[in-house]
Curated annotation (Swiss-Prot):
EC class name: transferase
Positions of phosphoenolpyruvate binding: K22, N23
Subcellular location, record wording: Cytoplasm
EC id: 2.5.1.7
Residues annotated for UDP-N-acetyl-alpha-D-glucosamine binding in this entry: R93, R122, P123, V124, D125, L126, D308, L330
Alphabetized UniProt keyword annotations: Cell cycle, Cell division, Cell shape, Cell wall biogenesis/degradation, Cytoplasm, Peptidoglycan synthesis, Pyruvate, Transferase
Function: Cell wall formation. Adds enolpyruvyl to UDP-N-acetylglucosamine.
GO molecular function, one term: UDP-N-acetylglucosamine 1-carboxyvinyltransferase activity
Superkingdom, taxonomy of origin: Bacteria
Organism in which the protein naturally occurs: Helicobacter pylori (strain P12)
GO BP terms: cell division; cell wall organization; peptidoglycan biosynthetic process; regulation of cell shape; UDP-N-acetylgalactosamine biosynthetic process
Protein name: UDP-N-acetylglucosamine 1-carboxyvinyltransferase
Modified residues (2-(S-cysteinyl)pyruvic acid O-phosphothioketal): C117
Pathway the protein takes part in: Cell wall biogenesis; peptidoglycan biosynthesis
Amino acid sequence: MDFLEIVGQVPLKGGVEISGAKNSALPILAATLLSQQEVKIKSLPQVVDIKAMALLLQNLGAELEWLDPNTLQIGAKSLHHTEATYDLVRKMRASILVLGPLLARFKECLVSLPGGCAIGARPVDLHLKAMQQLGAEIKIEQGYIHAKASKGLKGNDILFDKISVTGTENALMAASLAKGITRIINAAKEPEIAQLCTFLQSGGVEIEGVGSSELKIRGVENDALNLKDIQIIPDRIEAGTYLCVGAITNSQLKIHRIIPNHLQAITDKLIEIGFSLDIQENSIEIYPAKKRQAFEITTKEYPGFPTDMQAQFMALATQCLGTSVIEETLFENRFMHASELQRLGANISLKTNVATISGSTELTGSDVMATDLRASSALILAALVAKGVSRVHRIYHLDRGYERLEDKINALGAKVLRLKEK
């Protein structure tokens, strides 16, 4: 198992290129199961979750060829398997995304209940209810979802009681081969969903309302789609994380390959804190702030402040003047990084889903442990400004979603080493 050793308080300067969005790539990889022609997916990030999904597709019978480190060609014309086994699915929750496409194309599938990150309840009930609304029979037996629609799926209204990103994605993929019209009401509005819509539209699926909370889908009444090649959009959470690298170290950094309007909740908050940003069509440059003011954040669904940036801003709050307040409304157990930040000297108090952070705190290097993907990046941010050396353990969480993070930060001047645990 690896850990990162980080020397704190090293000056940073330069630029970072953002990788493709993991959270866009995963549903698009799953959607290739709907296609009878080969598809090339470009700008895939080389992270553990992508490799796990690729392995799952291969296990289902898809033919995979890596054309370069970030381009994958997938042929799913002759799949021979419609069972997503526990051994593969347990590695990440996003594996549930194969449910919709397998059911739509083959009218029956067996998918293990998923595993993945430990940040609270992420029930699959919303996914199952959506499949039932399209006419599927669902049974859960011995840890497996058995879904069946002998006569194929039929378009219908799907109302989500609670906004669900992966639930919306599964419903979209299933509806793309359903007969007639499906309306998804209270759909998630993330950019990653908009890109999935673009991908499905390339195969002839008619989708109205892209980017809104109500999607109208007219399915293609064939056995499969003919999807076209696609390039994954830049990762807005990775971009936000590197903006926070600049913010917490009060450095001048330029973030390349971004889509500015995907980052507005993050950039608005950084400007409120006191940073100057030069926002261009494909890049953002952050400049040191004369004074960094405390702030308040409430996490919300897109286009609100992303829950996936909450941990990074908690680390940043330790260096701001005054007391900051962060309210987490989307997930339970998502403050597990707080106790690890406290090991570095952070002054944080928690009350249910609200964290209060006292700023202007001098952090000191220590051994800390990552508890989930975004918590790991928050600990690295804090270590960059801590006095002395920090070691961040259990970084397999980090490797699930950040491509070559230590290489990218070291290119800015940081001193970060990946080492093996003894």
